[in-house]
Amino acid sequence: MGGNSIGNLFRVTTFGESHGKALGGIIDGVPPGMKLSEDDLQIDLNRRCPGKSLYITPRYEHDKVYILSGIFEGVTTGTSIGLLVQNKDQHSEDYQSIRDLYRPGHADYSYEKKYGMRDYRGGGRSSARETVIRVAAGAIAKKYLAYRCGIKIRGFIAQIGHIKCELKDWNQVEQNPFFCPDIDCLEALDILIRNLKKYGNSIGAKVTIIAENVPAGLGEPVFDRLDADLAHALMSINAVKGVEIGDGFAVISQLGNENRDEITSQGFLSNHAGGILGGISSGQPVIAHIALKPASSVKQPCNTVTRYGNEVEIITEGRHDICVGIRAVPIAEAMMAIVLMDHFLRNRAQCSDVK
């Protein structure tokens, strides 16, 4: 199986399955000399961690990360950083009933058609459990980017179902289980998720990620545009079905004189482009949005077939998120950090002499 790595100079490779013994990763390209500890990574892992509230999956994993290599006396050495997170709370028996069934909306059917077999326990490699290592890798990138040039990467829930959340207060994001910046939405979100849980259903979401203090010049022309790489990285997150940069699809109804970001001696007057022009960062905040589909594992019965072609009715068992968008916030932050870190190192390698 290919497709387990992302990045060029800052390269992240992950391995492991949802119900395997552990998940791990190899992070190449981390510059030497940066102070780094497991505690630095644990902060974001705890934000993503399952089982910590009634609004997300009850599967409880501590997600304790172990750094296996690449650190000496608390400082990065420049060699590969090995990461490991053990699985502790697998309930593989929950999936015995679907070992020969394809769950609609999941990767069961497509994985088996491609490989001739599949790990039916929690989706195996296709599970969002894999993203635990991405978040750890993203935490490394976040720390370096903040230390090196003051880049700050943050995300929030912009919408769950019909409830739209405005960016009113960044401080609120970490004060509630929804990563919501709009205190006026919290009661409605609580009622929505509780009702969905009661009736065994799920809902989609929109997540916004913003990177501030990104220097101008990150990104390559044509095929390696910064926004192209961001879209690739964000689309690789489980359940993501759409990515927008800046105003995204809203540009369809905008006029040219509305959409262009005018420039003065004091800087840009707007940021419809989301901080990227011609695939290269402009120095403005880099803004992206992702749309996540509702989880397909719900208690509502539906039709499917067995691997032998027999038509059957299925109700998906197991422990699942009611809204996958909630825990996607730190995952999306991590993917933006990984891309920005890679392009920062690439730009420094090629253009360090440019004044």
Curated annotation (Swiss-Prot):
Reaction it catalyzes: 5-O-(1-carboxyvinyl)-3-phosphoshikimate = chorismate + phosphate
Organism phylogeny: Bacteria, Pseudomonadati, Pseudomonadota, Gammaproteobacteria, Candidatus Palibaumannia
InterPro entries: Chorismate_synth, Chorismate_synth_AroC_sf, Chorismate_synthase_CS
Pathway(s): Metabolic intermediate biosynthesis; chorismate biosynthesis; chorismate from D-erythrose 4-phosphate and phosphoenolpyruvate: step 7/7
The name this protein goes by in its record: Chorismate synthase
Name of the coding gene: aroC
Species this chain originates from: Baumannia cicadellinicola subsp. Homalodisca coagulata
Enzyme category, top tier: lyase
Single GO molecular function: chorismate synthase activity
Chain positions recorded as FMN binding sites: 125-127, 238-239, 278, 293-297, 319
